[in-house]
């Protein structure tokens, strides 16, 4: 199983959409607090529809608590400052894919602690600053899931 990590998410509908995505793919979701909204925010519930009960969500008090609880063996950070494209990574079961807050991305303290090959990016045309968080998560999730052969999915010939 793969893991999505949202570092201090700010916009409830994005997190709700990602909850729904995790329910549909079997990925686990980790949220590193503080969040920019309350967990019972109606916009979060609306975007996630009734998928909350089908998603494994773990909330962590802060980044240190996340590291202590999960001890990720392979942690990839999505950043516009990354070099390898998300599709150049050979994903493995158990990987963690971390995304920063919508308005500022991941802090330098986290990025600087990772090797260059674990700071990955989604290719974009020149002069594009960033993608919407839930869209970016979807792009990476489906590439990783595809590489692993869509475990748990119902595939039709």
Swiss-Prot record:
Keyword Cell wall biogenesis/degradation annotated: no
Record localization: Cytoplasm
Gene Ontology molecular functions: protein homodimerization activity; RNA binding; tRNA (5-carboxymethylaminomethyluridine(34)-2'-O)-methyltransferase activity; tRNA (cytidine(34)-2'-O)-methyltransferase activity
Cysteine-cysteine disulfides: none
Catalyzed chemical reaction(s): cytidine(34) in tRNA + S-adenosyl-L-methionine = 2'-O-methylcytidine(34) in tRNA + S-adenosyl-L-homocysteine + H(+); 5-carboxymethylaminomethyluridine(34) in tRNA(Leu) + S-adenosyl-L-methionine = 5-carboxymethylaminomethyl-2'-O-methyluridine(34) in tRNA(Leu) + S-adenosyl-L-homocysteine + H(+)
GO CC entries: cytoplasm
CDD domains with a match to the protein in the record: SpoU-like_TrmL (cd18094)
A Pfam family of this chain: SpoU_methylase
Keywords linked to the UniProt accession: Cytoplasm, Methyltransferase, S-adenosyl-L-methionine, Transferase, tRNA processing
E.C. number: 2.1.1.207
TM helices/strands, residue ranges: none
Matches recorded under SUPFAM superfamilies: alpha/beta knot
Gene Ontology BP terms: wobble position cytosine ribose methylation; wobble position uridine ribose methylation
Record's signal peptide: none
Residues that, per the record, bind S-adenosyl-L-methionine: 78, 100, 122, 130
UniProt enzyme class: transferase
NCBIfam families the UniProt entry points to: PRK10358.1, tRNA_yibK_trmL
Family: Belongs to the class IV-like SAM-binding methyltransferase superfamily. RNA methyltransferase TrmH family. TrmL subfamily.
Function recorded in the entry: Methylates the ribose at the nucleotide 34 wobble position in the two leucyl isoacceptors tRNA(Leu)(CmAA) and tRNA(Leu)(cmnm5UmAA). Catalyzes the methyl transfer from S-adenosyl-L-methionine to the 2'-OH of the wobble nucleotide. Recognition of the target requires a pyridine at position 34 and N(6)-(isopentenyl)-2-methylthioadenosine at position 37.
Subunit field text: Homodimer.
Record protein name field: tRNA (cytidine(34)-2'-O)-methyltransferase
Taxon lineage: Bacteria, Pseudomonadati, Pseudomonadota, Gammaproteobacteria, Enterobacterales
């Amino acid at each position: 199983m793969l893991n999505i990590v949202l570092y201090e998410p700010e916009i409830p509908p994005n997190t709700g959409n990602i909850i729904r995505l995790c329910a549909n793919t079997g990925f686990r979701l980790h949220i590193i607090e503080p969040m920019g909204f309350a967990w019972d925010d109606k916009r979060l519930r609306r975007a996630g529809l009734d998928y909350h009960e089908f998603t494994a969500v773990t909330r962590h008090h802060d980044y240190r608590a996340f590291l202590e609880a999960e001890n990720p063996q392979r942690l990839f950070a999505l950043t516009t400052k990354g070099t390898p494209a998300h599709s150049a990574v050979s994903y493995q079961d158990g990987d963690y894919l971390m995304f920063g807050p919508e308005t500022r991305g991941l802090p330098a303290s986290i990025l600087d602690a990772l090797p260059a090959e674990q700071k990955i990016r989604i290719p974009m045309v020149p002069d594009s600053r960033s993608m919407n968080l839930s869209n970016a998560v979807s792009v990476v999730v489906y590439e990783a899931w595809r590489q692993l052969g869509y475990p748990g999915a119902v595939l039709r010939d």
